[in-house]
Design a protein with these regions (language model features):
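Rossmann-fold dehydrogenase core element
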Residues: 114-116, 124-162
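Short helix-loop-beta connector
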Residues: 17-23
Length: 189
């Protein structure tokens, strides 16, 4: 998981230009998002985890996230709740492969903020005068691999996995699709 999820999470956090006390929201707490929480915390960021599943937010809490928000189907209500309880974010990272979530992330950051999109999908329309930056990123380089290994060793990153025998690969995929796995599924031959 470090060479796929770990590198993707690391690269996305780096793209968000982390620094101490920067308010970063992570949309999509699963196989990649749970790693991003840890990388952002190592950088000293104030991290908010956003997911539609409570069980994923429980994982985020165990990993030290500062705030958790349940993503609701009403974008307007979600944004009002976040702004009222916490204020807008400095940056957001999107791992959830849903265009509406990307749109919500863009709307959840301050003027001058940044959204890092680390998934596939379309970038919704946004207003240029809000001075927001949108960056795309996926996977990383050989140097990123070295950095992830070093950071993992020095900080004891926790990779949350659920294992399945290879014969249950289809079951694992169905569980992943239905968000029934806390983070990463690993097949064992």
């Amino acid at each position: 998981p470090l060479f796929c999820a770990g590198i993707t999470a690391y690269k996305a956090v780096k793209a968000a230009e982390p620094k101490k006390n920067k308010k970063i929201a992570i949309f999509g707490i699963g196989g990649v998002g749970h790693m991003a929480i840890q990388f952002a915390k190592i950088e000293g960021c104030e991290v908010s985890a956003i997911s539609r599943k409570e069980k994923h937010l429980d994982v985020a809490k165990k990993l030290g996230t500062d705030n958790v928000f349940v993503y609701s189907s009403s974008q307007e209500q979600f944004l009002q709740d976040v702004d009222k309880k916490y204020g807008l974010f400095d940056a957001a990272i999107v791992f959830a492969p849903v265009d509406e979530v990307t749109d919500t992330a863009i709307k959840s950051i301050k003027k001058g903020g940044m959204v890092v999109v680390a998934t596939v999908g379309k970038i919704p329309n946004f207003l240029a005068f809000e001075e927001k930056t949108i960056r795309g990123t996926l996977i990383g380089s050989r140097k990123d691999m070295e950095d992830v290994i070093k950071i993992s060793d020095e900080n004891k990153l926790e990779v949350v996995t659920e294992t399945f025998p290879l014969e249950q690969a289809n079951e694992a995929l169905i569980k992943l699709k239905n968000s029934e796995i806390d983070a990463r599924a690993v097949l064992i031959p």
